[in-house]
Structure formats: C-alpha cells, structure tokens
Amino acid sequence: MKKAVVLLSGGLDSTTCLALAKSQGFACYALSFSYGQRHSAELCAATRIAKHMGAADHKIVTLDIALFGGSALTDASIEVPEFKESPEIPVTYVPARNTIFLAMALGYAESIGARDIFIGASSVDYSHYPDCRPEFIESFQSLANLATKAGIEGDRFTINAPLQYLSKVQTIQLGTELGVDYGLTVSCYQANEAGEACGQCDSCTFRKRGFKSAGVDDPTRYQKCVHI
C-alpha cells in the first residue's frame, strides 16, 4: 500500500485531508506538532481523529516554542482579535510555520518510504497567511525534489494540497461525503481545554459560515459565554 504523511492539526481542513488521503488508498502517517499553542485541545482532537480514522501511525513532535515568537497563537500576551475582513496578514500568523512543518514531514516521509505529503492549506476563506498560497506549495515541492536523495534519484515527492482552491463550504461538503465526523475537530484559535470554541476568531468565523452555507449541521461546541 502506498504511504502518505498527513499533517494533522486536529482542525476541519487537515481532518478532511486525512479522509481524502485514505479514500485514495494511502496508508496514512499522521504528523502533529506541539509548538506552544494556546491550548492542548487541538492536539487532543488530532489524537482522537487519527485513532477514529485508522491512521497507520500518529506522531506528535514537540518544537521549541522560542522559535515561534510574535504570534497571537503562541504568545498569551498578544490578544487573538475578533474576525474582520482585511487583506492584511493578522497577528495570528505564526512565522514560517508551514515551512517548518513541511520540512519535518518531508524528512519523515523520506525515512518511511512515503512520497506523498498532504497539507490542508487553502487560499480561499483564509487569513492571508503567505504559507497557504499555491505558489508556496509549488515552491516547496520543488525544494523537496532538489534537497532529498529520493528526489535527486527520480523517486519524486508530491506535496498534495487538495483543498487549495476549495471554499470552506466545498471542503465541508467534501468531508461530509467522505464521512468525516466534524464533531471530533477543533478549529478555534483560543478554544478552552474542553475544546469549546470562542466563536469570534477568524477560524471560528470561516467555520460557522461554512457549515451554514453548506446546509450541514454545525457540531462545534461553543463556550457558554459566546452568543452565536
């Protein structure tokens, strides 16, 4: 069976990617990261999801949180803003996060003989993070095949970003068709330890809009003080 490394945050997009990779016949090796996030709920979700969806293995890599300063997702002194439409890159951007995650996934993939890596990056309904754009994914794939023994020998890597051009509505519709239980996922930037969402951040807003527009019941659990 073909192997794939799937970056799994515990959120809606990465879980859909895991389901899609499995539907394509891959043995999926899920890879998650502890990098000083505000809460552990998403990693708990990733663990549940990997087990529920039958991942071949699930590894959680701990990174030095000092690498990721200046982001509201890793620095409790920086407030996570409520959603607002803006072309600017918000304070929730984590410096070079996807570059680091993909580099780790690449090394893991080469070591286990996998040549496919899945990432839930999307350039639609997103917060303008530069490392979610298609040109970044294409460039990293080029790097992967220039910087590895396998790539140089012609056993090429593919960086799969199947949600790249899908709206949140389309992603939810796809996942629903694949049987994804979105009640297992946590997307909120500042969920509490029980996995209950704030309902106000960018990620919550895109998620709420997606379920509503898709006509799919939203299984998200919200904090009691939140008015939805």
Swiss-Prot record:
It is an enzyme of class 6 (ligase). Its cofactor is Zn(2+). Its EC number is 6.3.4.20. InterPro entries: QueC, Rossmann-like_a/b/a_fold. Pathway: Purine metabolism; 7-cyano-7-deazaguanine biosynthesis. Binds 1 zinc ion per subunit. The keyword Metal-binding applies. The keyword Coiled coil does not apply. It catalyses: 7-carboxy-7-deazaguanine + NH4(+) + ATP = 7-cyano-7-deazaguanine + ADP + phosphate + H2O + H(+). SUPFAM superfamilies: Adenine nucleotide alpha hydrolases-like. It holds the Pfam family QueC. GO terms for molecular function: ATP binding; ligase activity, forming carbon-nitrogen bonds; zinc ion binding. Zn(2+) binds at C188, C198, C201, C204. ATP binds at L8, S9, G10, G11, L12, D13, S14, T15, T16, C17, L18. GO terms for biological process: queuosine biosynthetic process. Keywords: ATP-binding, Ligase, Metal-binding, Nucleotide-binding, Queuosine biosynthesis, Zinc. Belongs to the QueC family. Catalyzes the ATP-dependent conversion of 7-carboxy-7-deazaguanine (CDG) to 7-cyano-7-deazaguanine (preQ(0)). PANTHER family: 7-CYANO-7-DEAZAGUANINE SYNTHASE (PTHR42914:SF1). This is 7-cyano-7-deazaguanine synthase. It comes from Legionella pneumophila subsp. pneumophila (strain Philadelphia 1 / ATCC 33152 / DSM 7513). The lineage of its organism: Bacteria, Pseudomonadati, Pseudomonadota, Gammaproteobacteria, Legionellales. The gene is queC.
